[in-house]
């Protein structure tokens, strides 16, 4: 482990987080929230000092290997959440550390689960910071750092791979920093467009920006207790729903459109399946809830919004879908696991993995029926290598193990099975709301501190695609190089 490089990169990340506290500080000044301003300034100064100390001297070896990349990403997200929780604690808006940590992890991981019973009782600047973490975490903390700070291309791709959602990640540009800049430029443009559209249909600038942050990062934090349903506006709902769907698409598609490679953009197999699932689910749920709303338009309106919100893992709500029929709730729970596209800001297992698992299952079945047949799994028009298939299967196995273990631990709180199951599903898949006692109109406040920490771990595991968090806690991660270990073992054997 290259500890100097680890500290150096973390130092830069702390300096970036210190800078990220500037926008909410400005909001605090605008609304005259001086105790909140004090909390932001104290946290920012502490982060800046720590960042300067750690990043004061560049290490001799600046190469980031796979192990360092995984550890840096995991530590960065954990520590950013710890420091990001401090303004909530210092200001008194969320006085207890576990609650503040849960809320901040939920923000950065774009989960949207909350411990707040009355979100509208919070100060404007703290609500802004809460939603701003959604936006920063959507594209990735490390991607943001690489976009704004000079980062060497010396295997920095390991950082992007460790943080990016999906079974694989490719470079848009030959340079890592250029890739990060292009991604964040597209991300920023879409966010600005949505904010302007929401303002044009009547939302105040503050509400429009908060809503856009939640949709862009697919995090779903709102400044209203009733989420998007508080506005009672079909226009606001449709704009938000469309942009949730757009942010759930692989950003490579937008890059292809940008450079006018329309054939490659529309040939994306994952995008076609993703849009097909949204259409089919919307029609199925609309048919099932028709008797609740009495007309086709209202049924489609609520169905499309909630399907888009859940499959993109945003978590916004326009109605209490806890009251919907069992079939509709079952569809939404299934979509929690599907998730959005790889390379998007959405969470979940990802449509690409679902496609690969279905195709490999079909291949295995064909091999049983026709042992001598030669079959190849193809995805996006290309044959998949064994390494990719193995990686997807390993991910799914680890996902299942973590899900089962987390469910067993959360069950200690003695809530009903649906609440327990969907609480874990919503956190591990970065959804936000679940069903029953963790539905869209209630919160996670009643869980014990231990369970909140377990669910926070699940959020981080889900957002970072499992491996970085597991590597962080693996004892072998912190040992020195294999050559050093071999020398130590040989020396021990002499005695």
PLM feature segments, named:
Residues 1-495:
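Membrane-proximal intracellular helices of multi-pass ion channels
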